[in-house]
C-alpha cells in the first residue's frame, strides 16, 4: 500500500504520523508459530502409544506412526474425546503385553494391550473399564505396562510409599486386587516399575521431590516416603540412580530433565520434599535416557513426540524450557519410549 498525499495535513498531525511510521519500522515482525516439521517415522514396531481419558476411554496407535517433531512444536491431534473427558494418561507398551490399571483405592485391574481399540493417530477410543467392577467414586489414577522391572512402587497423595514384587502382577493376578490402604496416606496417586536395588524419587504437584533408597521401604506395608505440605499432593514416582535423568513437565508445557547427581538421597524415607522445578502445577515426571523420546499429550488431545536430548539437563532448580506449544490448552500427561533408527535394523 502506497503512502497517500499528506500535503493537506497539519504539521503536528504529520509529525505524529511519521512518529508512528518510525515505530512500526523499528518493531520486528511477529512470526506466528507453526507446527514443527516431523522427521520420517521410525521402522514399524509392535510398541503402541496408548492414550487414555479421565473416564477410561482409550485408543492405541503403533508408535512408528507418530513422527518426531522438535521440542516446542505444536504436536498433532490424537485422542478425540469430549471436552468434559480430557486425556489424562499416556503409556507405551508392546502389543503382546498387558496394562495394569491402578485406581485411587489401590486396586489393580489387568487388561491386554490388544483389547484397546487401535486407530490412526487421530481417533476416537472406547472404554477399557467396561466389565470392570469399580466401586462408587473409584477412578483410574495410573497405568503401567505389564512388564518393566522387578517391583512396582506405589505412592499415595500424602506421601505413603510401598513396594510390591512383580510376581503379584503375573497371570494369577485377580482383577480388583488391592495393594493399598487409603487410611495410610490417602488415596493412591502414582505407580512405576523399579529394579529393586536403586533409589526412589517422589514428586509433588508443586514441583517438590525427595529421594531415598528403595531398600529402606519396609515390606509390603510400606512407610511414609515424604512429608507433603498442605495444599500439595504426590503426582509421580520414579526409580532412579545417580546416573539417571528425570523428565518433569508442568501444565504450561514447560519441562526440564533433572540429573539425579544434583539431588542427594536422604538417609531414610519420610523427609520433607525440596523444590526440584519451579512450576505452577506439575503434571508428570518419569526417568529418561538421552537416546529416548518424550511424548506429551494435552487436555485438548494434542500429542507431541520429540527427542529427550533436545532438553538441556540440569542439576539445579530451573523453570524449564518450552516442550510443547499450547494455545488455550494445558499439558495433561507424559510418557517415555525408545526411538529405533533405520540404521539400527541393518
Can you name each region flagged by the protein language model?
Residues 1-346:
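Short, structured "edge-of-domain" segments at secondary-structure transitions
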Amino acid at each position: 500500500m502506497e503512502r497517500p498525499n499528506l500535503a493537506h495535513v497539519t504539521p503536528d498531525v504529520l509529525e505524529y504520523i511519521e512518529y508512528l511510521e518510525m515505530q512500526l519500522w523499528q518493531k520486528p515482525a511477529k512470526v506466528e508459530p507453526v507446527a514443527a516439521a516431523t522427521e520420517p517415522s521410525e521402522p514399524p514396531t509392535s510398541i503402541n502409544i496408548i492414550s487414555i481419558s479421565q473416564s477410561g476411554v482409550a485408543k492405541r496407535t503403533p508408535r512408528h506412526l507418530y513422527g518426531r517433531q522438535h521440542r516446542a512444536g505444536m504436536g498433532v491431534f490424537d485422542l478425540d474425546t469430549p471436552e468434559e473427558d480430557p486425556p489424562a494418561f499416556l503409556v507405551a507398551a508392546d502389543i503382546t503385553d498387558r496394562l495394569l490399571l491402578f485406581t485411587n483405592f489401590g486396586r489393580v485391574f489387568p487388561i491386554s494391550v490388544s483389547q484397546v481399540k487401535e486407530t490412526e493417530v487421530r481417533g476416537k477410543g472406547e472404554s477399557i473399564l467396561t466389565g470392570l467392577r469399580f466401586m462408587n467414586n473409584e477412578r483410574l489414577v495410573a497405568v503401567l505396562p505389564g512388564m518393566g522391572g522387578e517391583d512396582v512402587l506405589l505412592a499415595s497423595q500424602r506421601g505413603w510409599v510401598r513396594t510390591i514384587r512383580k510376581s503379584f502382577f503375573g497371570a494369577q493376578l485377580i482383577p480388583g486386587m488391592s495393594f493399598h490402604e487409603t487410611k495410610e496416606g490417602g488415596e493412591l496417586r502414582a505407580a512405576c516399575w523399579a529394579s529393586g536395588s536403586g533409589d526412589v524419587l517422589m514428586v509433588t504437584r508443586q514441583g517438590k521431590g525427595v529421594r531415598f533408597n528403595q531398600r529402606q521401604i519396609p515390606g509390603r506395608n510400606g512407610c511414609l516416603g515424604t512429608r507433603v505440605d498442605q495444599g500439595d499432593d504426590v503426582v509421580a514416582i520414579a526409580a532412579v540412580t545417580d546416573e539417571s535423568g528425570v523428565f518433569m513437565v508442568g501444565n504450561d508445557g514447560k519441562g526440564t530433565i533433572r540429573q539425579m547427581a544434583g539431588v542427594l538421597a536422604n538417609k531414610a524415607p519420610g523427609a520433607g520434599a525440596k523444590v526440584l522445578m519451579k512450576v505452577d502445577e506439575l503434571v508428570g515426571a518419569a526417568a529418561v535416557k538421552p537416546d529416548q523420546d518424550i511424548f506429551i499429550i494435552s487436555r485438548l488431545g494434542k500429542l507431541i513426540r520429540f527427542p529427550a536430548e533436545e532438553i538441556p539437563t540440569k542439576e539445579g532448580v530451573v523453570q524449564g524450557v518450552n516442550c510443547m506449544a499450547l494455545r488455550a490448552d494445558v499439558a495433561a500427561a507424559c510418557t517415555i519410549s525408545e526411538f529405533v533408527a533405520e540404521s539400527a535394523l541393518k
